[in-house]
């Protein structure tokens, strides 16, 4: 309920549509190929003109690729990091200098799992495209078709240093939820940067409920989908040949799962209980080439060595410390610290409903794991490990190359912070995505400017009227 109230407040003012682009295209009705060319050229020209040579000078630079550079200079050009130079290095001619003295400079935050951009209000079905309860399709569903770049939470998260996010569907009719996407939070980004990025599956209690009421039923449904995909790969799944077989998934679903079998898409499995994790860890040996990623894994610490041996990464919230269900009786805030200590790659995300539209809180979750390490008997993370969990680790899990770091050739997703980004009192002062400085205005800042006492009335819009 608190999440619904929060999101409803964000929608207090309706966003006005930008009609300029629509008006300019009216003369091209009936010529979709010309419209596509014009739109594409306009976007390229806009991005090229916005990118410039920038030197961020004098900050405490967290590279995620080596030691922290105090007083360093980060050079950006053409949407990429050119170099991170030491303190006192000369700034090349032609670079606009941005003063970061006394500030922290880091890679942008990457949300490991979220539902930002696809669920404006979770409690309203018409504003929530994360699940399809009655659709005949399941694994074939592609979440990118629901991405709304005008969603209220996107500029809010961008203003708090989040530059990219992994968005995941929720299971509806079956335990196969569908294909998630990866998005950039850049202003004007109208489509995901990677439309079909992974397959998302629910196991454990949720998977059991969707598959018929038990974990054995969930395992059969999970492996049946992969077996049908394997049959399709070798040409055995055909309409005439299979007309007398009891097919549990559609051909479209099977085609989507062939990408999982080939390793083109990671298979993200939401699972918590230690015994369920052991069961899911059997998948890579049953289907060689499958790239498995565990999501949530509240009891992962109990089988951390097995997860590490299997070289399977984990994406989790990291804040669960109460037995919220029978599959999470072993939940503890030492979970992430124990898994990382065992050698597991762990990224932080917001897979839970109340937090899924709030990836802006990830730095604070990471900071809590640093504090956890200071408690007697608890296991947490070092500062470097915690910050990597919200930057470099998700980039590694999803094959994003050098994103999540500041080094030559890395994407120029950079945030200048007022202080330590894992401290609660810190805020993002400037945000660059692919080398373009981003606006930090949000719905909240507009409302504050409109309604705070002492604002000059003549320069403000009228309040809402019925």
PLM features per residue range, with description:
Residues 59-62, 70-71, 408-451:
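C-terminal cap of metal-dependent C-N hydrolases
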Residues 48-52:
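Boundary at the C-terminal end of the N-terminal hydrophobic targeting segment
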Residues 147, 153, 158-291, 427, ...:
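Polyanionic/metal-chelating signatures
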Residues 36-46:
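Bacterial N-terminal signal peptides
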Residues 121, 128-134, 139-140, 266, ...:
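His/Asp/Glu-enriched, well-ordered alpha-helical/loop segment
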């Amino acid at each position: 309920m608190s999440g619904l109230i929060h999101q409803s407040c964000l929608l207090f003012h309706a966003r006005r549509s930008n009609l300029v682009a629509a008006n300019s295209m009216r003369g091209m009705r009936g010529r979709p190929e010309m419209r596509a060319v014009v739109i594409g050229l306009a976007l390229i020209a806009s991005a090229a003109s916005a990118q410039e040579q920038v030197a961020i000078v004098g900050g405490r630079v967290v590279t995620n690729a080596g030691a922290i550079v105090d007083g360093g200079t980060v050079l950006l050009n053409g949407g990429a990091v050119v170099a991170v130079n030491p303190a006192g290095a000369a700034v090349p001619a032609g670079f606009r200098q941005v003063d970061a003295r006394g500030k922290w400079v880091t890679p942008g935050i990457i949300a490991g799992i979220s539902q930002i951009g696809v669920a404006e209000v979770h409690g309203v079905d018409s504003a929530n495209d994360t699940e399809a309860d009655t659709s005949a399709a399941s694994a074939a569903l592609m979440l990118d078709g629901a991405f709304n770049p005008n969603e209220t939470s996107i500029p809010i998260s961008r203003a708090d240093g989040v530059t990219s996010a992994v968005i995941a569907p929720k299971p509806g009719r079956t335990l196969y939820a569908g294909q998630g996407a990866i998005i950039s939070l850049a202003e004007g980004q109208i489509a995901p940067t990677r439309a079909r990025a992974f397959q998302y599956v629910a196991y454990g209690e949720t998977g059991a409920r969707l598959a018929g009421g038990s974990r054995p039923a969930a395992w059969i449904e999970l492996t049946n989908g992969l077996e049908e995909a394997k049959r399709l790969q070798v040409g055995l799944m055909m309409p005439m040949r299979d007309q007398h077989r009891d097919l549990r998934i559609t051909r479209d679903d099977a085609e989507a799962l062939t990408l999982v079998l080939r390793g083109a898409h990671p298979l993200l499995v939401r699972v918590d209980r230690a015994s369920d994790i052991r069961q899911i860890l059997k998948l890579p040996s049953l289907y060689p080439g499958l790239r498995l990623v565990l999501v949530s894994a509240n009891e992962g610490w109990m089988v951390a060595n097995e997860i590490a041996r299997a070289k399977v990464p984990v994406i989790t919230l990291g804040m669960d410390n109460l037995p919220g269900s029978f599959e999470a009786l072993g939940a503890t805030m030492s979970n992430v610290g124990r898994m990382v200590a065992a050698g597991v790659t762990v990224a932080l995300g917001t897979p839970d409903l109340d937090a899924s539209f709030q990836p802006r809180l990830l730095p604070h979750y990471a900071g809590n794991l640093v504090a956890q390490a200071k408690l007697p008997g608890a296991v947490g993370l070092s500062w470097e490990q915690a910050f990597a969990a919200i930057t470099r680790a998700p980039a590694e899990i999803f094959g994003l190359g050098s994103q999540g770091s500041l080094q030559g050739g890395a994407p120029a997703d950079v945030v200048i912070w007022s202080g330590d980004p894992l401290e609660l009192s810190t805020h993002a002062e400037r945000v660059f995505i692919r080398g373009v400085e981003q606006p930090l205005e949000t719905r909240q800042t507009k409302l504050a400017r409109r309604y705070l006492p002492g604002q000059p009335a003549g320069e403000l819009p009228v309040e809402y009227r019925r």
